[in-house]
Amino acid sequence: MTHQFPALSTEQKKELATIAERIVAPGKGILAADESTGTMAKRFQKINVENTEENRRSFRDLLFSVDDSISESIGGVILFHETLYQKSDKGVLFPKVIKDKGIVVGIKVDKGTAGLAGTDGETTTQGLDGLSERCAQYKKDGCDFAKWRCVLKISDSCPSALGIAENANVLARYASICQQNGLVPIVEPEILPDGDHDLKQCQYATEKVLAAVYKALSDHHVYLEGTLLKPNMVTAGHSCTKKYTPLEVAMATVTALRRTVPAAVPGICFLSGGQSEEEASLNLNAMNQLSLHRPWKLSFSYGRALQASALSAWKGQAANKKASQDAFVTRAKINSLASKGEYKPSGQAGQASTQSLFTASYTY
């Protein structure tokens, strides 16, 4: 037990830690633009835009081609496989467009969920086969971090011991493989907001899941300084009749994290989990204003909560590009402020930013 076979060299560790720190530098968070083709279909349907490869490229070009000052708010962008090999309107590959702004490029590497037989509809996540080779290729193609999402749910029987153990182990195995290939793993154990559970129930489940995840990461010799965590905020279920304030959400979330996430982890980038754009910003802001000691950066890794207003403004029309970009930049700046606890809402939130983005049993 005393001897150790070092998983990573000193140089490898240094590279991973540097990448992780760059992504969560003060005031910076992550733009999750890794929606699958199927998920983009749902997004586009709402604005009556056909889900073609060109339309997907066009919308992402709009996000990635905003002014370079976006790098003050966005430290990393997560891409979907298709997007990694697409080009901007000017014919430049997207990873280069993003890197030239000083932003780190990431890639979603999981292959979606699969049912766990004998459980109440719980899942594990697929994609470990061939992952090492894919990571090596992605690193060559300009990526420096990766994302893998595991999904858990809350009900009378969930999350079960099997569901927790299996997903924790899969996340740890993924994280280890990423680090061997020079990619910083974003570890994402998402507890879905579906259900009528209250804040306390979500906090309890979140603590149990995160404790298991960090035990598994330790068992697999994962270098924590070269990882990031992407958890759910502790919120009540969408069908819960009691509504909680951002302060209550912040207290429950930070308490759960303080109990389970080692101080060696450089940053925690929350998923927005179907909250409205404004709600996601207010909750993050409240966390960063708490007097509780927080050893890690608390930031964002938002998809819908950074893109909803931009999508509504765009409507698939080139003429709306500027308005759409402005909407995206505005949200990015607000979340940058929230990640420092400096967001002061004006009370002027637009309709698109206050609309719930909840989708039942959400799949990317």
UniProtKB/Swiss-Prot annotation:
It is found in: Cytoplasm, Cytoskeleton, Microtubule organizing center, Centrosome, Centriolar satellite. GO terms for molecular function: fructose-1-phosphate aldolase activity; fructose-bisphosphate aldolase activity. Homotetramer. It is an enzyme of class 4 (lyase). Substrate binds at residues 56, 147. InterPro entries: Aldolase_I_AS, Aldolase_TIM, FBA_I. It holds the Pfam family Glycolytic. This is Fructose-bisphosphate aldolase B. Its main location: cytoplasm. Pathway: Carbohydrate degradation; glycolysis; D-glyceraldehyde 3-phosphate and glycerone phosphate from D-glucose: step 4/4. It comes from the Eukaryota. It catalyses: beta-D-fructose 1,6-bisphosphate = D-glyceraldehyde 3-phosphate + dihydroxyacetone phosphate. Belongs to the class I fructose-bisphosphate aldolase family. It comes from Danio rerio (Zebrafish). Its EC number is 4.1.2.13. The record marks 364 as: Necessary for preference for fructose 1,6-bisphosphate over fructose 1-phosphate. The gene is aldob. Keywords: Cytoplasm, Cytoskeleton, Glycolysis, Lyase, Schiff base. The active site is at 188 (proton acceptor), 230 (schiff-base intermediate with dihydroxyacetone-p). One of its GO terms (biological process) is glycolytic process. GO terms for cellular component: centriolar satellite; cytosol.
